[in-house]
């Protein structure tokens, strides 16, 4: 008998940066950008309408960053190849899309106090 307990978190199952991505970032091959939740779902819905694939919320962040980069090129007239990774479909995340389309999904940012509290708790684990 095999049992599987899914994490409580929706979407991402690993809230961190992988080793390869971290090294590419450190070596200057890529840059990290901040994409808010609503912008990412805007991009995901646009992608779904254009491509017929409902992207996973994780992929929506990459799609939003790609759209930003394409818009920069459009404004400057620069031609470039822009590559992104569609990591998966969003079929198990339809509840999140429902919240977004219903207007119930909001951008959320941790306060400095929240961040400090979490860091303090991590320090207590050692």
Regions found by a protein language model. Name each.
Residues 12, 16, 39, 61, ...:
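Glycine-rich beta-alpha junction loops
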């Amino acid at each position: 008998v095999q049992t599987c307990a899914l994490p409580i978190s929706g979407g991402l199952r690993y809230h961190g940066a992988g080793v390869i991505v971290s090294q590419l970032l450190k070596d200057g091959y890529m840059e990290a950008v901040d994409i808010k939740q609503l912008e990412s779902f805007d991009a995901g819905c646009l992608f779904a309408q254009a491509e017929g694939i409902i992207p996973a919320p994780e992929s929506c962040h990459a799609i939003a960053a790609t759209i930003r980069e394409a818009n920069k090129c459009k404004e400057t007239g620069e031609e470039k190849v822009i590559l992104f990774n569609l990591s998966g479909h969003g079929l198990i995340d339809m509840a999140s899309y429902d919240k977004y389309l219903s207007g119930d999904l909001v951008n959320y940012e941790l306060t400095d106090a929240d961040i400090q509290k979490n860091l303090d708790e991590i320090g207590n684990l050692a």
